[in-house]
Amino acid sequence: MTTSELPEHLAKHEVRYADHRQVERDRLTPMMQHYAEVKDQHLQQILLYRMGDFFECFFQDAIVVARELELVLTSKEAGKEVGRVPMAGIPYHALDRYASQLVEKGYAIAICDQVETAAQAQGPLVRREITRIITPGTILEEGMLQARRNNFLAAVVIAGEHWGLAYADSSTGDYWTSQSTGLEGLTQELYRLQPSEVLFPSAAPDLAGLLRPGQSKPQQIPDCLPDSFCYALRSPMPFELHEARQRLLEHFQLRSLEGCGCEQLPLAIRAAGGLLDYLGETQRESLAPLQKPRTYSLSEFLILDQQTRRNLEITQTQRDGSFHGSLLWALDRTMTSMGGRLLRRWLLQPLLNPEAIRNRQAAIQELCQDGRLRQDLRSLLQKIYDLERLSGRAGAGTANARDLLALAESLLRLPELAQLLSRAQSPLLAQLQQVPPELEQLGDRLQQHLVESPPLQLTEGGLIRSGVAIALDELRQQVESDRQWIASLEASERTATGINSLKVGYSKTFGYFISLSRSKADQVPDHYIRRQTLTNEERFITPDLKERESRILNAQTDLNQLEYDLFVGLRSEVSHHVETIRAIATAVAAADVLAALAEVAVYQNYCCPEIRDDRQLAIQDGRHPVVEQALPSGFYVPNSCGLGSDRGPDLIVLTGPNASGKSCYLRQVGLIQLLAQIGSFVPAKNAQVGICDRIFTRVGAVDDLATGQSTFMVEMDETANILNHATARSLVLLDEIGRGTATFDGLSIAWAVAEYLAREIQARTIFATHYHELNELSGLLKNVANFQVTVKELPDRIVFLHQVQPGGADRSYGIEAARLAGLPSEVIDRAREVMSRIEKHSRIAVGLRRGNGSQRRTQASPQQIDATIATEQLGLFSGPSH
């Protein structure tokens, strides 16, 4: 940043130096010299420098902060020869709010805080140190986190087509690692995680710092890493195998990584070690305790790519990205933040293991049948705070007294929870039948030591109850005795002086004083010492008052320090139990999710699906879980679906009018499959669900302006991905393939895609289309069936029945939809005229009905097809008749 980049209002007032590196250091004031020295070490972060009650920024950081936070940009004298330099500041008590805004915009922040008071300072400057570096992926502060979302930091190592991935949420302690082959899998895993920050090793020395979302990526970052994330480019050294392994072994005090499951996964180890190094560098003394890394494989879970997650609107809507209207919105009846985060993870990682699915079903079934147990459980869970993050802040040394009280209250609920679930039969609920007794003891100890309503600040006293420590009680008694002496001083001095308006007061600047009106000042005794003269007031002190003040202030300082030390001891005690607390928190979160899913199942009338080992998908009277909640009760029209059985089709060609509900039906089937594989009940009268390895969707498309791809090219890319990766155990949901190009081209592509899916892949597929010619496929392939969304035709309009029934539709009623949308009547009339001519002359399917490998058909010659096409084009657009 150059001087010319200074804002105009600063440039006009002789404010110079838009960058601290432009200034000769020996010309700066001592404080500014220290600021510049610290800034040299943190060029890639915004430096927030504590000065009294404010965190200040200077030079280039001040300009950035003022711009991004819309704060007033002012200036400060930096030295006689330097003049004024840019300055912006935020109140120290509002740090979380402003830091959160900067982090959301992709900035990293270095906190340079005062580590001693002015009274403790040995020299002219109060000692300041970097106490914390806040980056998007390393946030611990409660006010900067979303309660029901994880805040993941990820690290990636790539070697050819092989990759290693580690990710952690330092606020909850989650720490996972994986290794696989195929960069597309890495891309999709990052999309699933939505990490706030991604670490990537780079040897380029000039690429340090954060790349914010949307910034152009340097060549060192491969194309498989999406532009939508924030990247921190790191030195390769911590990502070297030996360095990374050693760091993991030392940090977790292990002899090998066998127990973590990654001993034979070198890329996973490198990613995990590089991530741990970054956390140590950024969190310094407040490094949050992490669980030992756990290893997982992509093959353990149903694969949902980014396209499918978006089309099925699992966590946010496709239209505006809002939570309201998503599947998560429809299901989230969890009572705790931990449960909310876990439900999100379950929805994004459906299971493939039938036994694990059935275990969840068993717990939900028990909670559905025992309504009293379910309601009591949910009421109790509502009183439990976020055990994961509370214990994490305690372990990191950042928890305040209110955090520990919330933790204590939650820990003391656990025995009650164990008693409530003592009669539970399902293994997932039985996990909470035994609670470690030391957690109840810890909760008792915290409640007995901390006052009921402690302040947020830890260094100003008022934290610890009386009776906890003898020394504390003695100090309090001394302070109280001296304060009572001062309180009685006003009455005794009024009597002694005869001045009834005399008052005893206190100010931070001058301490305790005796106040008199100036008209009475000549009546004061000789031992009064004048301290301050104001317009209408004189302030005095006495030797006794000064002595008492000194005793009070010294005792209060000692008292505050002792309370703080006792609190730190309590917090340290909690940190020794973090692993145990988090283990029980995992079980509590699971119980919360299971109870929430049971609540939805009961009130929305869901059924328990039969999980099968074959490919069958049989849904009787299925419903869309989100749409039915948005409609009045009973308004949603249920529909059935059968795919993958010996008697049923593998591919359904679904036809019907515009706006009749085809896309809703596709999503409904996909969501029921997904819900079944997270162990949930499903919105249907009955359901048999075979395990699915992957759900593919291609529903709607828009131009990708960022890459210059048209709607049709986006559609073809997505379709190619499906055809190249689908298996017989996949579920494929396609809507209007081929619509983005010319009619003949689109129909040809749609036919070929449907034929390939049914004949070659044999994936369970629903193929929604307006190409009614595709109904011919059912006569050529035994595993294809035609279904339609029905309408009722009235003389002047049509009524959408939203019922899916066997058979193919021969009309789309697009002109009727256009009329309902309000197109001018002359346009509608002309469209009907053109349509009648097309229907009269069209033989588009002549080539498709003949051939296609069928022994019952003969192949049409090119000349026949050309003649047909020419006939169709004659007279269609010759103008309206009169």
Swiss-Prot record:
Q: Name one GO biological process term.
A: mismatch repair
- List the coiled-coil residues: none
Q: Which residues take part in binding ATP? A: 656-663
* InterPro entries according to UniProt: DNA_mismatch_repair_MutS, DNA_mismatch_repair_MutS-lik_N, DNA_mismatch_repair_MutS/MSH, DNA_mismatch_repair_MutS_C, DNA_mismatch_repair_MutS_clamp, DNA_mismatch_repair_MutS_core, DNA_mismatch_repair_MutS_N, DNA_mismatch_repair_MutS_sf
Recorded GO MF terms: ATP binding; ATP-dependent DNA damage sensor activity; damaged DNA binding; mismatched DNA binding
The alphabetical list of record keywords is: ATP-binding, DNA damage, DNA repair, DNA-binding, Nucleotide-binding
**Pfam families associated with the record:** MutS_I (PF01624), MutS_II (PF05188), MutS_III (PF05192), MutS_IV (PF05190), MutS_V (PF00488)
GO CC annotation: what is one? Answer: cytosol
Q: What does this protein do?
A: This protein is involved in the repair of mismatches in DNA. It is possible that it carries out the mismatch recognition step. This protein has a weak ATPase activity.
Entry's family note: Belongs to the DNA mismatch repair MutS family.
What PANTHER family does this protein's entry cite? Answer: DNA MISMATCH REPAIR PROTEIN MSH1, MITOCHONDRIAL, DNA MISMATCH REPAIR PROTEIN MUTS FAMILY MEMBER
Protein name in UniProt: DNA mismatch repair protein MutS
> Taxonomic lineage of this organism?
Bacteria, Bacillati, Cyanobacteriota, Cyanophyceae, Synechococcales
Protein encoded by which gene:
mutS
